[in-house]
């Protein structure tokens, strides 16, 4: 549904939330492994989405879904990293205990991107840094502009262009 089909921005936001809330929750829970923290992440992500609601063209489009899922994923990863930093400060001597406290690894499989890339390309993309992968996917999978990507990821347009250039170079080397 296009934004023009909604009478108010509030009804657009409500429809968008209803459409994606289950997947948003699943992504956040998959990364954080805590339902309460995931709820907070979904709320924080919705605030970011609301601030950028002008970027939503059709709530049922793949572009909108990837926009929403990328914000949720990045917000959850920010919380995870912050939590990890706090835990690192608590641990002073025993590194092996630290590994047991934070767990083995994050389950990124819950964030299945549907950018239209072949399996071979997805394999190459998996070798990139997370931010570079997001930039490549948003640029070539969704046709986002540098400005849209910079707004979404919270970095400058020049940084987007530089990261995109480096990511393409890295992909060419693979």
What is each stretch, according to the model?
Residues 26, 40-47, 51, 62-74:
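Structural recognition of an alpha-helix C-terminal capping motif at a helix-to-coil junction
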Residues 86-114:
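Internal acidic/polar
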Residues 115, 119, 125-133:
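Short helix-coil-helix linker/hinge
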Residues 124, 141, 147-174:
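DNA-recognition helix of helix-turn-helix
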